[in-house]
């Protein structure tokens, strides 16, 4: 594996849930736009030139073209390439067209140094859970096979393993085991990152690091049997990818984003 490249910084944000108009999407929630703006301001201040910002799904609560355009306006403050995925709340076709028309990536692959970043579409029309279609699974394998000298990071919206919250584990990636079985066949796959769970997660499947990310909006209570909110700050994940295949990561919580209604 070549090691002549510099290290790569990738930032993950997820589950922005922008509504039809700025403001809370439901009672007790903070303003989705204000939360996102605070996260992006912090991100831009803390990281002046990331190599890529990945937005891993549930981009919109109301999946309409003007909402995705408003999200893109928010993201325009970032001095970095952007790639996104659809989640269960999104309209994949509208979201994809909006991002591509704006010059950003959606699904697909991107080479950064000697790393290959792959976005997998797990959106499944009519379902809260996710599905990696046979076409997507084959695309992922083909992409990895075309880059035998690159380390691999896979991004998907739905969690590929149970995360310890019963209600969330029922709506994860329905064929996550199949995806992981395929990824395990390729020694250069180092990590799989995901959104959907509105909380940090850090686990392993064999040699593959599995990482979940806080939402820019509200957080879900870890280890909860039923839906429950956690009064924690919004956040994002920082990933540092090294030429030798090492990965370092941390979650950044953004001061001032703790939902007031959940802490009173």
Model-predicted segments: where are they?
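His/acidic metal-ligating clusters that form di-metal
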Residues: 38-52, 129-211, 245-248, 257, ...
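Metal-dependent catalytic neighborhoods of phosphoester/phosphodiester hydrolases
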Residues: 55-76, 91-104, 130, 165-167, ...
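A short, structured active-site edge motif that brings together acidic residues
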Residues: 82-93
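Active-site-proximal beta-strand elements of phosphoester/diester hydrolases
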Residues: 7-21, 114-124, 153-155, 208-214, ...
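Binuclear metal-dependent phosphoesterase catalytic core
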Residues: 30, 182, 201-264
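Acidic/histidine-rich helix-loop elements
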Residues: 14-35, 61, 91-104, 125-134, ...
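Active-site glycine-centered loops adjacent to acidic/histidine catalytic or metal-binding residues
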Residues: 15, 57-58, 87, 120, ...
């Amino acid at each position: 594996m070549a090691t002549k490249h510099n290290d790569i910084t990738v930032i993950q944000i997820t589950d922005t849930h922008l509504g039809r108009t700025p403001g809370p999407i439901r009672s007790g929630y903070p303003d989705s736009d204000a939360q996102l703006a605070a996260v992006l301001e912090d991100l831009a201040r803390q990281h002046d030139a990331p190599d890529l910002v990945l937005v891993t799904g549930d981009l919109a609560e109301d999946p309409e073209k003007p909402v995705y355009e408003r999200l893109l306006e928010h993201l325009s403050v970032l001095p970095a390439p952007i790639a996104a995925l659809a989640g269960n709340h999104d309209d994949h076709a509208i979201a994809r067209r909006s991002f591509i028309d704006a010059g950003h990536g959606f699904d697909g692959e991107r080479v950064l140094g000697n790393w290959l970043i792959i976005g997998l579409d797990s959106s499944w029309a009519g379902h809260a859970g996710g599905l990696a279609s046979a076409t997507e699974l084959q695309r992922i394998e083909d992409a990895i096979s075309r880059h035998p000298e690159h380390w691999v990071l896979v991004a998907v919206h739905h969690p590929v393993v149970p995360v310890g919250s019963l209600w969330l584990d029922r709506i994860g990636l329905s064929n996550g085991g199949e995806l992981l079985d395929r990824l395990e066949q390729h020694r250069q796959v180092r990590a799989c990152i995901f959104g959907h769970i509105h909380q940090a997660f850090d686990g392993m499947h064999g040699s593959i690091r599995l990482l979940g990310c806080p939402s820019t909006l509200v957080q879900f209570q870890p280890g909860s049997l039923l839906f429950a909110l956690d009064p924690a700050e919004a956040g994002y994940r920082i990933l540092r990818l090294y030429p030798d295949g090492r990965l370092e990561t941390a979650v950044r919580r953004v001061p001032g984003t703790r939902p007031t209604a959940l802490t009173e």
